[in-house]
Amino acid sequence: LHMIHLHWYQYPPMNPMMYPLLLIFMLFTGILCLAGNFVTIWVFMNTKSLRTPANLLVVNLAMSDFLMMFTMFPPMMVTCYYHTWTLGPTFCQVYAFLGNLCGCASIWTMVFITFDRYNVIVKGVAGEPLSNKKAAMWILSVWVLSTAWCMAPFFGWNSYVPEGNLTGCGTDYLSEDILSRSYLYIYSTWVYFLPLTITIYCYVFIIKAVAAHEKGMRDQAKKMGIKSLRNEEAQKTSAECRLAKIAMTTVALWFIAWTPYLLINWVGMFARSYLSPVYTIWGYVFAKANAVYNPIVYAIS
C-alpha cells in the first residue's frame, strides 16, 4: 500500500465486471502470443533457408514478445482474479522491469529491421550486406542498452509502482520530483520519439527508392514496346519491397500499441486530474496486444 500514490485513493474501486473482462482478454492474448511467437521462433530456427542474418532480427523480435507475455501473463491472471495486486512490492518492481525491458527490446529490434530494409532497398549494392556477426552485435546492443535503461529505477532514477487499476505495475508518472520526471522525459525519447524519427526517415527514402525504381521499369518497358519489364533482379527488388511493407506494418502496429501508454505517462505528469484507474487499463491492454501482432504479420509473409 505504501507504493500506491495518493492520487488513486480519491477514486472508488473499479466496476467488478472489469476484472473478468480483463482476465478473458489476457487469456486470449496470452495464448495467441505464446503460441504465435513460439511457432515463429521454431520455424525460423529449424528451417535452413530462413536462417539468414536479417531473420535473426525477426527471431529476436519474437523472443522479446514471447518473453514479455511469458513473464506478464501469469501475474495478470492472478491479479485479475483477486481484483488487486497480491504478489508483493518486490515482484511488482520485477514485473514492471520485465515489461519495460521487453517493450524497449521489441521497438529497437524493429528499428534495426527497418534500417536493414533501408540498407537493402535504398543503398542496394552500395550498402554493406548484413552479416551474422553484425546482426548478433545489433541484437546484443539492443538487450544491453534496454537492460541499462530499465534498471535505472532500481537505483533511484524514477521507480516502479502499482498502476491505478492495481492489476499491474509500471513507471511512476505521478511523482513531481524533477529527477523522477527527467527519467520519463529521456526514456520517452529513447523508446518512442527517437525510434519513430529513425523509422520515418528510413521509410521516406524507401518509398522514394521504390517509386524511382518502378518509374524506371515503366519507362524502360515503354521504350522496348512491352507492357512490363520483370527480370530476375526486378523480382528480387519486388520481394524486398514486399518485406519492407511487412516491416512497416509491424512497426506501425507497435506504435499504435504503445502510444496509449505514452499518453498515460504524460497525462499523469501534466494533467493527472483527467487520469482515472480505468484509463490506465488501456495502456497495457494495447501494449500486450502488440505481442500478438508480430507473429501474425510475419506468418503471412
Swiss-Prot record:
One of its GO terms (cellular component) is cell projection. It is found in: Cell projection, Rhabdomere membrane. Disulfide bonds join 92-169. Residues 44-55, 116-134, 205-245 are cytoplasmic. Homodimer. Interacts with GNAQ. It is a multi-pass membrane protein. The keyword Transmembrane applies. The gene is RHO. The keyword Amino-acid biosynthesis does not apply. Keywords: Cell membrane, Cell projection, Chromophore, Disulfide bond, G-protein coupled receptor, Glycoprotein, Membrane, Phosphoprotein, Photoreceptor protein, Receptor, Retinal protein, Sensory transduction, Transducer, Transmembrane, Transmembrane helix, Vision. This is Rhodopsin. It comes from Faxonius virilis.
